[in-house]
């Protein structure tokens, strides 16, 4: 899995559960792509498909995010610590339109709008699950 360095987006990330029981997660569905597992470095993207876009509606927050499909790989970098994790897109989410005014800051720079959700395995690679939200840069 190649992880790129070309800037794609920036915003907030949170974490979510999918697939088999693992860590803080009980067993749940395997996501829009049918492959999502909490124990693997995976993510949910709000413009996975047109149906996904219509539900997550990032445009309501002024986010015109590019379409990236199931199996696409992106590199997520914690804005504060510089820690990175390479993830495979495996689900639709987060529901960006619900978080338009939310922001997370560090080092005097704030990121707004939840633009990617990470599985617990991926989120733990760049921050503590207890933090709940992290400001991130996304590369491909």
Residue ranges, per PLM feature:
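Secreted/periplasmic proteins
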Residues: 1-140
């Amino acid at each position: 899995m190649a992880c790129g360095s070309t800037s794609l987006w920036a915003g907030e990330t949170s974490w979510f559960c999918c697939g088999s029981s693992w860590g803080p997660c009980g067993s749940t569905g395997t996501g829009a792509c049918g492959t999502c597992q909490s124990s693997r470095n995976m993510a949910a993207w709000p413009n996975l498909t047109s149906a996904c876009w219509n539900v997550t509606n990032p445009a309501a927050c002024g986010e015109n995010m590019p379409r990236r499909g199931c199996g696409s790989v992106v590199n997520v970098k914690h804005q504060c610590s510089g820690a990175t994790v390479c993830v495979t897109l495996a689900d639709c989410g987060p529901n960006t339109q619900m978080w338009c005014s939310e922001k997370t800051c560090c080092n005097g720079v704030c990121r707004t709008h939840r633009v990617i959700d990470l599985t617990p395995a991926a989120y733990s690679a760049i921050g503590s699950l207890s933090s709940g939200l992290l400001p991130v840069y996304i590369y491909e």
